[in-house]
A protein has these predicted regions:
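Hydrophobic face of alpha-helices
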Residues: 23, 123-126, 197
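Active-site-proximal loop/short-helix segments
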Residues: 110, 154, 193, 200-203, ...
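Glycine-/charge-enriched secondary-structure boundary and capping motifs
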Residues: 8, 121-139, 152-159, 211, ...
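Single conserved hydrophobic/aromatic residue that forms the stacking wall/gate
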Residues: 1-16, 20
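Acidic, glycine-rich loop-and-beta core segments that form the ion-binding/anion-interacting portion
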Residues: 182-221
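Glycine-rich phosphate/pyrophosphate-binding loop regions near the starts of catalytic domains
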Residues: 28-190
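Residue-level signature of catalytic and energy-coupling elements of molecular machines
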Residues: 11, 68, 181, 253, ...
């Protein structure tokens, strides 16, 4: 057809294409996460995943799906000009959310939106996802990028991930088996993970007057590197414990709302928990933020994970076995117990 004079579409999305297809290095890197179950390569309209091989391992398989984002941690990445860890955060945050049901993560999809596409930054972000997917045994089966200058401010990014997993129906962990006398076992975090960043930025940068490059004596590293510590992925912790035949009555991923708001999500009616806050070591980043803002302890526990990234609820007799399974993987802190209550969390 011969072009005619008139208005033409010059929007950023037109002709942008898929960044994965345009960069062979990224394409090959992403493909390296594929298991034999993945039937389509990158660039297809959809991703095909063969379920038949899984049917031999499950009597009644149930799909578990979740969606999550990195939130304003991307602002720290932008300040640091360091984007290779927020892809790890994205996969870990999503995987941990389905692990609490006992599910094994299988596939992952990502969505990256920004004001203006920078292939170098996208490559860094995806490299983190690829590393996390390889470490977790998850196939990164597809992704979407969006360039929207009318929506995002210069330099802004938004990351969203969708994960799919599988669990045997009669082994789904719901928390309904939790009983008085069960114990709470804490798995340590390494920092904020992906929650509480708006509050943390206000404390460090607005109230404390710090820059990302500053290195307060209270921290082992700079403010920026401390805040960018990647979200721990607890896939190995959960699956190895379950594969050892140990029954976990409940699992909590400690995200926004901290221990105070996440533990009640899985407690049956008539149950609460008591937690000994001295049962695990405090992290310097939380101590410093508390000091900067003169923040009450209850508010800290409601805003941050306070050093515990995941909680197992189990029988007291299983403590030793769980510690044996996780020896060399993670410390396990006996942090409290289940008591009579109204889905309340008492921290002593």
């Amino acid at each position: 057809f011969q072009a005619e004079d008139g208005i033409r579409d010059r929007s950023p999305s037109r002709g942008l294409g898929d960044v994965y297809k345009r960069q062979d290095l990224i394409k090959n890197s992403v493909s390296s996460t594929f298991t034999s179950n993945v039937l389509t390569g990158l660039g297809s309209f959809g991703s095909l995943y063969d379920l038949k091989p899984l049917l031999n391992e499950y009597d009644n398989p149930v799909m578990v799906q979740s969606i999550d984002g990195v939130g304003t941690k991307t602002i720290i990445a932008r300040k640091m000009k360091k984007y290779d860890t927020i892809g790890i955060d994205l996969l870990s945050a999503a995987a941990n959310d389905i692990l609490v049901m006992g599910a094994k993560p299988l596939t992952f999809l990502d969505y990256i939106a920004n004001d203006k596409l920078d292939p170098k930054i996208i490559k860094e972000i995806v490299s983190g996802m690829v590393k996390a997917c390889r470490d977790t045994g998850v196939s990164l089966v597809g992704g979407e990028t969006a360039e929207m200058p009318d929506t995002y401010l210069p330099g802004e990014h938004d990351l969203v991930g969708i994960i799919t997993g599988i669990v045997e129906k009669d082994k789904i962990i719901t928390g309904e088996k939790i009983r008085r006398g069960n114990v709470l076992l804490g798995l340590p975090s390494n920092g904020l993970h992906t929650n509480g960043y708006s509050f943390a930025r206000k404390l460090f940068f607005d109230v404390g007057g710090y820059d990302v490059s500053d290195h307060p004596k209270e921290l082992e590293d700079s403010v920026g590197n401390t805040l960018l510590m990647p979200h721990i992925n607890y896939t190995k912790h959960v699956l190895e414990t379950l594969n050892a035949g140990i029954e976990l009555k409940g699992i909590v991923h400690v995200t926004g709302g901290g221990l105070l708001e996440n533990i009640p999500r899985i407690l049956p009616k008539g149950h609460g928990v008591e937690i000994n806050k001295d049962a695990w070591p405090s992290l310097p980043v939380f101590d410093l933020m508390k000091s900067i803002g003169n923040i009450e302890e209850a508010e800290m526990f409601r805003s941050f994970n306070m050093g515990i990234g995941m909680v197992f609820i189990a029988e007291r007799d299983d403590i030793s076995d769980i510690r044996k399974v996780l020896n060399g993987i993670s410390p396990v802190y006996l942090m409290g117990s289940v008591v009579n209550g109204n889905k309340n969390v008492i921290i002593k």
